[in-house]
């Protein structure tokens, strides 16, 4: 879609990811990373009996949009590192705006935007052990999107 130029008209946020280098994924730009996350998310969908039956438009759109906030939040730190603070929150707002412009259903917009905003929640507990309260908070915040959020997080790892 980006190579053909179609993204400029449908999802103009995607071409902006091509030259954004994420320090956690130095070997690829954010666009390539996004395509890998999308492929992984599709692979994590379940059959009709599972919690995330394929094809799952919600999970796929969340995977596609999960890092769209990075270009707007990129900051060069004094130590030479690059940060994307709050790209999850900014990305969720951008996702909501784009999906509204494309006339998606309000429930789908809410779910995809929530997944984009929550996609880093699990990573906040990587360096510390999870407390019972942290587990309850994660499950509560994910709500009905719990299985999708787990798959999105795993695809983004």
What spans do the regions from the language model cover?
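C-terminal subdomains that position terminal phosphate/3'-OH groups for nucleotidyl transfer/ligation
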Residues: 16-17, 23, 40-157
């Amino acid at each position: 879609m980006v190579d053909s130029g179609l993204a400029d008209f449908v999802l103009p946020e995607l071409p902006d990811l091509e030259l954004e280098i994420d320090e956690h994924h130095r070997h690829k730009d954010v666009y390539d990373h996004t395509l890998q996350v999308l492929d992984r998310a599709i692979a994590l969908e379940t059959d009709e009996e599972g919690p995330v039956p394929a094809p799952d438009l919600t999970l796929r759109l969340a995977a596609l949009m999960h890092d769209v906030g990075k270009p707007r939040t990129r900051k060069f730190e004094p130590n030479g590192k690059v940060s994307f603070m709050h790209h999850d929150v900014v990305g969720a707002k951008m996702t909501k705006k784009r999906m509204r412009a494309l006339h998606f259903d309000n429930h789908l917009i809410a779910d995809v935007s929530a997944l984009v905003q929550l996609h880093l929640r699990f990573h906040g507990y990587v360096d510390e052990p999870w407390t019972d309260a942290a587990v309850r908070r994660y499950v509560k915040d994910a709500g009905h999107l719990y299985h999708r959020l787990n798959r999105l997080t795993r695809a983004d790892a």
